[in-house]
Amino acid sequence: MPKRLMPTRDNLRRSHGALNASENDIAGVELMLYLIRASDVIREEIYGALRRDTGLTEGKFALLMILYDISEPVPLVELSVRIGVSSSTTSIMVTRMLQTEEPLVAKTVDPVDARSALISLTPAGRRLLESAMLPHFNRVSDFAKTLSSAERETMIALLKKLVAGH
């Protein structure tokens, strides 16, 4: 991924000057631009490598991790909520994981509500996920090593605060 050229604070002052933007507003714009850039870098370096190594997208990895963590069949709707995507998106992911040579998930009818599907991890899904977890964890850990432990904790607290109301 080519490195995105980020505007300087002076560039932002010039471009937002006509709006009578305060220094705090300009800093907010710069913050959002760097958060977007950080997200792009994480997606490429962490999830791009995961996809190249395993064929798993960020969404499929999240879905498999939820199933792995819960260790029992989960209603499709609950998976959607936990991943943060629509039921139709989750349904498409599940369908694609059912269509692999060795299906990564199993889909059964909920015995309590026949209109609902339950999704569970297959042995093939578990093997793929377990083989991916250590390299993925190491990539994430290596990426975060740029920051000290204290900086990481501060950033976590600030990001939680930033997203709490949204």
Q: Where in the sequence are the language-model features?
A:
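Exposed, interaction-prone assembly regions rather than primary DNA-binding/catalytic cores
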Residues: 150-166
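Charged, amphipathic alpha-helical coiled-coil/dimerization segments
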Residues: 95-153
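Short, locally clustered residues in the helix-turn-helix/winged-helix DNA-binding domain
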Residues: 36, 40, 65-71, 133, ...
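N-terminal helix-turn-helix DNA-binding core of bacterial DNA-binding proteins
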Residues: 26, 44-86
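N-terminal leader segment of winged-helix/HTH proteins
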Residues: 1-54
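Pre-recognition alpha-helix immediately N-terminal to the DNA-recognition helix
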Residues: 30, 34, 45, 62-65, ...
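Residues within the DNA-recognition helix of helix-turn-helix
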Residues: 93-96, 158
